[in-house]
Amino acid sequence: VQTETRAASTLIAPYGGRLVDLMVPAAELAEAKAYASTLPSIQISSRATCDLEMLATGAFSPLDRFMGEADFRRVQNEMRLADGTLFPIPITLPVSAEDNLKLGSDVALRDSMNDLLAIMTVEELYAWDAGETGEKVFGARDPKHPIVAEMARWGGTNASGKLRVLQLPRHYDFVDIRRTPAETRAVLEQTGHANVVAFQTRNPMHRVHEELTKRAIAEKDGVLLLHPVVGMTKPGDVDHYTRVRVYKALAQSYYEPDRIVLSLLPLAMRMGGPREALWHAIIRRNHGANHLIVGRDHAGPGNDSHGQPFYGPYDAQEMVERFKDETGVGMVPFEELLYLPDEDRYEEVSKVPAGAKTANISGTQVREEYLGKGRLLPAWFSRPETAEILAESYPPRHKQGLCIWFTGLSGAGKSTTAAVLQELLLEAGRQVTELDGDVVRTHLSKGLGFSREDRDANIMRIGFVASEIVRHGGTVMCAAVSPYRATRDSVRAMMGEDQFVEVFVDTPLNVCEQRDVKGMYAKARRGEIKEFTGISDPYEPPLQPEITLNTERHTPEENARLIAAWLADRGFIRREVPVSSNGHIAA
């Protein structure tokens, strides 16, 4: 179903001319729900749930379903749907063999809480390759890219077909500003402005963002669509509850009422850089915007496993600019602004007078020098409301959650070092939970074997529990072989870069074999144990661990004190860490 927009609209038409509407009409809803209750059902992921909501309301117009093979292949290769329409990101529904889908049949789609969302007629089932998609769409096979690591765990088959949406995913927070594209357009219409400048954000807004957006709407003589993402963003981002409180405070106090519309977007970001920026432009057009502010490294995931950025700083701006005639959305560049303290104003870097005194605070400094140390951000950098909200929601680093992940071969010394470190952290005032790989297998992962699939499941279970501990401000130490790089990166992505410390216990195989307290290596050499890491199954060492330990040169206590000193240097523990009797702290 597609709905007409109002003929007299002053706003740009939706992408493709009309907004898709997949909602079952109210008159048919009871019958459709009764029918759905008789169908087999599958639970879809949080990402697919976000995508379904965006499809249902027309945010992905002209797309009206999870992509079939023809659309998927062409989008992957050419950034276009099968009919030639520009569309840069694949929107797919991965399924597994266990879902037991049959072509031509109907299936009910449910979310993670088992709430009934939609009926899908299975019209296509087709194979896809996560590595190929990572390379062609996101320019990477590196599991340090969060979507690449995530896709490796998706099913190898995609399903597609007609969707009849019975209800949108339930939201109980900020319901007054959760608006569909049609609802957003209606509010924008009331402002009387034909030009709409959209600002995509997944971070708190500071004075520089306020200044930038005000300049943009003045330049375009338009209204600002402040459109923060509240679906899935980059792991480790400030939670959306905190961010939205900031946005609401700024919108209410520092913008003219008819010059801003704050609306939340339930988008699951891919952190896909230039392709994602183009996708954002299409989504914002469907919400009524004809301009999009695009910053440096827009939707970038950070650095790869070799410490290099996945995308160039201006790739996203160039992509949106290149296709502006097709999307109908102009690119407004996010110019870098500096504060001039002597004049109490912001100015573009290129226009700062020679010799003028300037001030700036980087994102890293915000986290480490201010929030991480319990200091309020200065008024020239953030509005008082923003500074107070962030201070309330973002405790000093020594009170933040933390995961210390020990990885290495069996017998490397992970558990021994972790046991010493636990006492040092307790001494420093940290409350610590230890998740040891051997112990976990007798409880949380009881019944799992040692196939690659089972090993991944074991590590992901440990990671999930650890992420919940971290989310609630606790400290957790995990000691597990965790041989596969992609799986470790997936666990890192559950917590974010700042709260995950990967410790590589770099003990050579021959040393581990000499220790062999459990006799496991001897059994593996005799062929009595299959798929044993280091013997018949590979161990993939970390490429850029936060800490690397040498257990041949240093004792477990020395290595534990090295880790504790590293944590103290970065503010994770407050009290000074005593050095060992020989004065050793660092390798």
Question: What are the residue ranges of the model-derived segments?
Answer:
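Active-site cores that bind ATP or allylic diphosphates and position pyrophosphate for catalysis
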Residues: 2-398
